[in-house]
């Protein structure tokens, strides 16, 4: 089984917290990993250029997005608890909780807002991604390494010839 993306994990996180219990991030991560029957390899997989565990990181981003939308709160460091608004959403049995759904909350829109005033071109379309910022950074770093290796190899060959 592939590790679910952070947006696919938002519903399980909200559903788990719908019992009203304040839970630690570790408890949320382990409980959902068990519910999804993730293997030990899937639970411990890390990013290529960073020591963070993929699944744990995706759960953390799912929690962050839910918190920014006001569906969960963090009463103490590294803990989460459902809010009354989160309880309403959990009870509505929404098919899929995603970024588009979260955009209805002003606090989430403010969190996602990017000041485009300094950009040369102001685009009207939004780029939606299912990758976390850490995954995007990992991809960029890998791409840079590949490009650097190719350029280094080509430059080395030119010097030898």
Residue ranges of predicted features:
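Intrinsically disordered, low-complexity serine/threonine- and proline-rich regulatory segments
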Residues: 1-9
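Short, positively charged loop/turn segments that connect secondary-structure elements
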Residues: 2-3, 33-59
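Hydrophobic residues on short alpha-helical segments
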Residues: 10-14
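Short capping segments at the starts of secondary-structure elements
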Residues: 17-27
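Short, hydrophobic-biased segments on the C-terminal half of alpha helices
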Residues: 63-64
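Glycine-centered, phosphate/nucleic-acid-interacting loop/turn motifs that mediate DNA/RNA or nucleotide
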Residues: 70
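Accessory beta->alpha helical hairpin/"wing" motif in late/C-terminal subdomains of nucleic-acid enzymes
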Residues: 73-97
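Mixed-charge (Asp/Glu-Lys/Arg
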Residues: 88-161
